[in-house]
Amino acid sequence: MTIDPSLIRNFSIVAHIDHGKSTLADRLIQVTGGLTQREMKEQVLDNMELERERGITIKAQTVRLDYTAKDGKTYVLNLIDTPGHVDFAYEVNRSLAACEGSLLVVDASQGVEAQTLANVYQAIEVNHEIVPVLNKIDLPAAEPERVKEQIEDVIGLDASDAVMISAKTGLGIEDVLEAVVTRLPPPAAGDPNGPLKAMLVDSWYDPYLGVICLVRVIEGTLKKGMKVRLMGTGATYPVDGVGVFRPKKEAIDSLGPGELGYLNASIKQVRDARVGDTVTDDRRPADKALTGYKPAQPVVFCGLFPVDSAEFEDLREAIERLALNDASFSYEMETSAALGFGFRCGFLGLLHLEVIRERLEREYNIELITTAPSVVYRLHMNDGSEIDLHNPADMPDPVKIDTIAEPWIKATILVPDEYLGGVLKLCQDRRGNQVELTYAGNRALVVYELPLNEVVFDFYDRLKSISKGYASFDYQWIEDRVGDLVRMSILVNDEPVDALSMVVHRARAELRGRAMCEKLKELIPRHMFKIPIQAALGGRIVARETLSALRKDVTAKCYGGDASRKRKLLDKQKAGKKKMRQFGKVEIPQEAFIAALKMDDN
């Protein structure tokens, strides 16, 4: 039995972090009876422990709700809950492509934020009908009229008939459901008997069933027992089962045009089920694939090393497991003289990096050292070839390099105007070019072009502290640009420490180098001989600190007598220290690495 597409509504909820979209999803599930009172818990759709704890949504989730509207018809509503954070923009992108409309949730006390903007523009790009919803109107600080004006000024959406709700108390939830049914369009009616065409929206790994794929059927019918082909990879799989989430899994016979559901087909790895791929019938394939998805490109790279080198195998297993579930995370093995065996991993951004690191530490109990995050540099060599550099330690001889290009981003920052000066100074310090500056009410919208290298380090933390937490920030990649970049090595006791080398802009090398040397001077324990700590660009030392030696007071036993006696003892000690320094090894403790990599810019 296929459902009449005019009774289906596929919609997603877009919002900035903490504006209450997961709570709204909970209420919608509760009102339509998706779960009994007893099974309800906060943030039903955020399954990952980390998601609940940080209150952020990382993986997109879906749920199918049956709702009997005021016109007496029963509608099938497919809700896709999307993440709100920049790093997971690819999750948002593909969730939106599977829907026809969006609910734009804005906190009535906070107003429009940078990520609200970013996600709304993505929804507009895929031609969504958008219904504004003002949440948290039960708060004393709520100013719905001001926020409506803001939505109209900043985003340009008509907010006169925005739905007023409080997801926490359940106020206005019925109005949201009515708005979904009346104001959002149904999916385009596909032919249920045509060749199967379905878009793969998401995929994750289930330890019992293999990979489970979330699909949105465009044309044809997806049934249990048929053989499907993924058009991107060409691989074929028998369908073991199809079903829907309400939010618990429920098997059904078939999925028709416009419907969203899951299929499991003994696929071994999430990498085989590429998001955005087209699923079709192997016997009667569709002529051409749906307009595809760009695979997510990792932007930030860093090394992950186990604190205890005996845990390397456990780390490998944990990383492989995480990669099963996260196709945008890439990894390869690497070794470091200072840290031993580990992995060089690619992430979508800093939050993604932090989330993965926390999951490794928490779900697999592995203590990790993370090296300084770096971006991918494109090296144009003198012989005309191009190299992508993921790790600053692998940089070839500078003589052979013609130019080095680094990725630039366009950053959109929304900030209350009293903090604007500090934010502009921060962007200027980070080699930014101002693109525009506009005001919406008492908030300034600043758009800057910045090198990603400068943002990766700690831009977000600095931005938050300058603006006392009020600024919101969102970025997208624009292009690679050639810059005057050099590799800076850190030498401890004349030995280069590979884990601390980094690529910096020549103008800021001395500053960065000096800060690093000072930091290491505090962190490395004193030895029996003096240790020079230097920052070098090629053969030129740009900064130096000296860690003085621990020494015994050798002249304590001399009372009076000849000065040459004292001199002899001091010279003997000096000769000993010199010999010691030749053969001595400096042990840099792991805490020193970790702290040095968290270096801030002041």
UniProtKB/Swiss-Prot annotation:
- Reading the lineage from the top rank, the first entry is Bacteria
Q: Where in the cell is it found?
A: Cell inner membrane
Give me the Gene Ontology terms describing cellular component.
plasma membrane
Instruction: Name one process (GO BP) from the record.
Output: positive regulation of translation
Q: Which residues bind GTP?
A: D18, H19, G20, K21, S22, T23, N135, K136, I137, D138
Q: What are the EC numbers?
A: 3.6.5.n1
Q: Which reaction does it catalyse?
A: GTP + H2O = GDP + phosphate + H(+)
Q: Which residues form the tr-type G domain?
A: 6-188
Select a single GO molecular function from the record's annotations and give it.
GTPase activity
The alphabetical list of record keywords is:
Cell inner membrane, Cell membrane, GTP-binding, Hydrolase, Membrane, Nucleotide-binding, Protein biosynthesis
Q: Which CDD domains match?
A: EF4_II, EF4_III, LepA, lepA_C
The record describes its membrane topology as: Peripheral membrane protein
HAMAP family, per the entry: LepA
* Function, as annotated: Required for accurate and efficient protein synthesis under certain stress conditions. May act as a fidelity factor of the translation reaction, by catalyzing a one-codon backward translocation of tRNAs on improperly translocated ribosomes. Back-translocation proceeds from a post-translocation (POST) complex to a pre-translocation (PRE) complex, thus giving elongation factor G a second chance to translocate the tRNAs correctly. Binds to ribosomes in a GTP-dependent manner.
Q: Which family does it belong to?
A: Belongs to the TRAFAC class translation factor GTPase superfamily. Classic translation factor GTPase family. LepA subfamily.
Q: What is this protein called?
A: Elongation factor 4
Q: Tell me the organism.
A: Maricaulis maris (strain MCS10) (Caulobacter maris)
